[in-house]
Amino acid sequence: MTIYFKNKYSLLAFLLIIAFFAGCKDAWKEHTEPDMERLDRTLFEQISADATLSTFTTYLVKTGYDGVLKSSKAFTVWAPDNAALQNLDVAVVNDTAALKRFVGNYIANQSYFTTYPKPSLVIRMLNGKNTVFTKSTFEQANIIRSDIYVKNGVLHTINSASTPKPNAWEFLQTRADATLQKDFIKSLAHIESDTSKGVLLYKDPVTGKGVYQDGTTFKVSRNRYFQRIADISSEDSLITYIILNNTAFNIEKNKLAAYNKSSNALVADTLTQWSVVKDLVVNKVYGINELPDSMTTVTGVKIHLDKSAIVETRLLSNGVAYVVNNIGYQLMENKIPTIMIQAELPDSLRVPANPVTRIKNDASGRRFTDLQTGSITSSPSPLYYYRYKSTVNSVKYEVYWRAVNDILVLPFSMKVDFNTNRSFGSAILPLATVGYHTIPSIIGLAPTSDAYKDAYKEVYLGTYTAENYGTLYTFLASSLAASSTAPTALSLDYIKLKPVN
C-alpha cells in the first residue's frame, strides 16, 4: 500500500513538471517568435495599417517617403501618433520642403532596437540631423510601442513630436539679439576653387600655385570661420557654442580693440571682431548643470560662463548653445597669448656655418632642443643672426630667453632685436632691441653647482611694445668685435614674449 501511493505521487509530480516546462516553452515560443505575417509587410504597410498613425501616413505619402519605406533597404522609423501631430504648425504641413525635413527627422538608415542604446545612441536621421535614442525615449518623446520588426526594418511609435533641432549656425541665424556675431561670421564667406578632384598640370614657378586641367576644379562657397575655427554648421561633431548677444558683443569689442590695432581702421575693426568670436566653440557638450569653472575652446583659450549670464539654453542637433550677456576669461597669457619662439624653427638664418640642432637634458633632467652655431670669429655687417616670424597683438611684451653656453669656455653675448618687416636693419636704421646679454659658460662646472643650475634658468631681457597687431620678426644676433682669438657664438632654446598690461 505504501509503495503504491509513493509511486502514484511520484508519477503525478513527474507529469506536473512536464506540463510546467511545456507551458514555459509555449510562452517563450510565443514571446520570441516573430509575427510571420508582419515579416511580409514593409514599414510603410505596417504604418499605414495602424489607425493611430494615419496622420503620419499622410505625411509620408505627401513627402514621398512612402516609396522609401516600401524599398528593400533597412530603416528604423519612430512614428509620432495622431495625438502627437495634432498641434504641428500648419506652416510646416503646407510647406513640402519643411514637411520633408520634419518627416525625415523620424527615419534613420539601418535597424535600431531598444536594446542597442547603452544608455543612449546619437543617430543620424534622413534629414541629416542627429537625434538621441534611449531604451525608452526618442529625444524628448516617450516610446509607446517598440521593436515592431518588419520585412525592411523596425518601427517604434512615440507620443510627441517637434520640428528638427537646428545646428549651431542655423540657431545663431535666428537670434535677433545676436545679429552682430551672426553678421560678422557671415561676412567671412568667400568663393574659392575646390581642387580636391582637380588634375594638376604643373605649379606656377612664380606664384607656386597649382595649375589644373580645365573642368576638373569648380567654385565653391566657403567660410573662413568654419575653416579656421570650427564648422558650427556641421552635424558630424558635438559642441558647446557660445552666442554673445549684441550687448555682450559690443562690450567684448570695446575691451579687445586696444590689442588689435592697425594703421588701417577697417583692418583693426575686422581683427577686433575676429578676436571677439574666435574663442566661443568648445569640442564637448556641457549641460547647464555640468558647466565647469572653465572650458577650453578649440583655440586653446579658457573661458568661464556664469549661469546668471545665460539668457537662453538651446539643445542643438550638433550639441548645445548658450546665449549670454557676458563672458569671462583671463586676458593676458590666455585671450592675448604668450608667444613661444622655439629655436629650432627659424624663419631665416645668416650664419657662417650650418647650425646644429641638439636634444639634451637641462639641470633638472627635462629634455629640450636648442639651436647652436659655435666659434663665430667675425662680426660682419649685418651681424650673424637667427630670424623668427610670429604674430603678435598690439601690447607690451616682457622678453625672456633660455640660452645655454656649453660651446665656449669663455662667456659670449647675444641680443634680441625686433622688426615688423624681415630686414635686419643697420647701424643707420637700428632695430628695436632689448640689448646685449652675456651667457656664462657651464664648461667645467659641476652639475650639482648653483652656477650650473642657474645657467639653465629663463632670463628676463627687457620689454618690447608692439604698436599694431600683425607679423613680428624676432632676431637673435651675435655679438660685436668677434675674432679668431675672441670668438663668439649663437645658442638658444627659446625666446618668450609674455603679454603684460
Predicted regions and their residues:
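Mature, structured domains of secreted/extracytosolic soluble proteins
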Residues: C24-N501
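Sec-dependent bacterial lipoprotein signal peptides
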Residues: M1-C24
